[in-house]
Amino acid sequence: MNLIHSLEQEQAKKNIVKFGPGDTVRVHVKVVEGGRERIQVFEGVVIRRRGGGLSETFTVRRVSYGVGVERTFPLHSPRIERIEVVRKGKVRRARLYYLRGLRGKAARIQDKR
């Protein structure tokens, strides 16, 4: 077995929830402020998932006070406490960049049955 592949297997998280573009997720992130650590929740729509192995990342978008906020998270990061799937979305694209130009009801995504 390849040495790099075996090292990646050791570092990878085992309890990852299955989700994809269009899904609404709630990401619990550990944030260090001064000397204390707390959990910050970031909820939004997954607009892309890229890479593979340890370098896999996903981008979550939400609108906060009328301003679009996008955050990219490494999937296997130790800073991510857990990922919850709130809703499964029905989309036909792997990259949902078109949501950046939509506002209000136009930016809604259908639920998967």
From Swiss-Prot:
Alphabetized Pfam families for the sequence: Ribosomal_L19
Single GO term (MF): structural constituent of ribosome
Keyword check for Cytoplasm: no
Gene Ontology CC annotations of this record: cytosolic large ribosomal subunit
Record keyword Transcription present: no
Disulfide bond entries: none
This protein's UniProt keywords: Ribonucleoprotein, Ribosomal protein
GO BP term, pick one: translation
Top-level taxon of the source organism: Bacteria
Stored PROSITE patterns: RIBOSOMAL_L19 (PS01015)
UniProt cross-references to HAMAP family, sorted A to Z: Ribosomal_bL19
Job of this protein: This protein is located at the 30S-50S ribosomal subunit interface and may play a role in the structure and function of the aminoacyl-tRNA binding site.
Protein family membership: Belongs to the bacterial ribosomal protein bL19 family.
NCBIfam families per the UniProt record, alphabetical: rplS_bact
Protein name per the record: Large ribosomal subunit protein bL19
UniProt source species: Pelotomaculum thermopropionicum (strain DSM 13744 / JCM 10971 / SI)
